[in-house]
Amino acid sequence: MAERAQPSRPRAAGSPRAAGSSRAAGSPRAGSPSAGRRRADPARRAAYDVLRAVADRDAYANLLLPALLAERGLTGRDAAFATELTYGTLRGRGTYDAILAACSDRDQLDPPVRDVLRLGAHQLLATRVGQHAAVATSVDLAKDVCGPRPSGFVNAVLRRVATRDLDAWTEIVAPSRDIDPTGYLAVRHSHPRWIVEAFRDALGEAAAELEDALAAGNLRPDVVLAVTPGRADGKQGQEPEDPEHHALPVPPDATPTRWSPYGLRLAGGDPARYVAGGQAVVQDEASQLAALALTRVSLTPPERPLTGEPGHDRRWLDLCAGPGGKALLLAGLAAGRDARLVASDVRPNRAGRVRSALRRAGLTPAVVAADGRHVPWRPGTFDRVLADVPCSNLGSLRRRPEARWRKTPEAVPALAAVQRELLDAAIESARPGGVVAYVTCSPHLAETRDVVTAVAERRGDVTILDAPAVLAEVPGLHASDPRFAQFWPHRHGTDAIFLALLRRE
């Protein structure tokens, strides 16, 4: 049964209820020198600055926000509040914009004012910040970043927003569920209409789960680590035979992931001490399982092994290795089987990061900067090949909420063309009897099923394997084509990772 997502109602650090005070965080104390000149508090200002950078410079919130918090010395509850404001506002933007439009008599808003209003709407509709504090601090923020002129407008609009809760507003501003169910879900769950349609298509016969899938995309994801095999237990390459048995000792601030024997879910959410020492990388559990699936498939021995060449199951390839999470897991497992992984990425800087990550983990790197479509090695060189291809990232909207507003349906065909080329090159790199794993962080059928079936049919020298059977311990992997495995956040608590396994004949 699908896990129904519950709405997040975080206690906001710096809000009157969170702080136990009627004074909003960051506002001056009575009698202080600046008491007559209210300024935006640091947490709200940090969230605003990230929103503007996302809009103006195409910045990534997950990269910019931690650096900004460190630069401004925000820690503890202030950092947590800034994080909630940033990600919550980005996730809910579509819904908030529809509500703000209903509360404003202006056809267009200046972008800075609009972001102030979005932050205010999120506080009013999705956090425990009190109404007075949410409105007053938004007015202070508007004065700080836009000057005094729009403050009255911000005050009036947010007071209108505060007259109803989120569910009541949704019923007013969303299209009728009966007349336009796609439009209703798009507004209710803050996803562009085309993404709602893409998810419905990907769910296929399970389309009744669509609302659960969209709601899960708005939940805050856990921080999950993939620990390099051999770093924690000294047993490189030995995946436990019993999937119920975890391969690693579990530290007190973590819990094992449900299915990956190398996954740890952090309670505290700070992975720095593990990542810096080379013990682990941040990696979603579904991504770990996709890499593990490649290592589980039995190989057909080569018909005519070349004299002097490494024998059966000795050469593995990660074709699109950056930023290196799957490469670390594969390299650790390969070392335990007397095999060696070659990691390749088209961008030299990403290839360099993969090399550094492998070295930190104590692994001998074999890293190549090369376009995966035009590889420098001979055809048939590798026994196992991972093609974790560039994609629309529609499967990781929990982690990159701004991506839903940047991607367009017009970009998908060009991505699919590159994906077909990369899968073709991956198959060409595998020897006869070797195995290829095709992986995307998107459930869009044009990037998943359609790519694999088109390449397989055109080539005629590959067999599509039963991927869900290889990951038999994981329930609910069925996709529109039963040979493929599709993870979903509402079913598995993971990103929406797609996996196909192919054997070259």
Feature-to-residue mapping (PLM):
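S-adenosylmethionine
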Residues: 1-505
